[in-house]
Amino acid sequence: MKIYISQELENGSDHWKKIFDSLESQRQEAGIRTIVVACEAENSNKMHCIMEIPSMDVVKEFMTRPENQEAMKNAGVKMEGRVMIPLAD
């Protein structure tokens, strides 16, 4: 299963990407694989990614872990604007 995620950032994509990359091993342990991650060409505060995931439940559980909530906050993710769309294969 794949998921599309779009979210607004407060501090730009470079700052966000450093923190995102630091969590790669935790994502791998959860069975989450990043396919593509990029910001918009004209807006470095708008991030998009597509990930391969075991299920929506796994992603939701991963994102609600306190340590990941803190990481997203530190990365400048605006939680209220996040879009998560499951994709058909």
Residue ranges, per PLM feature:
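Short S/T/G/P-rich N-terminal loop/turn motif that feeds into the first structured element of a domain
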Residues: 1-69, 78-89
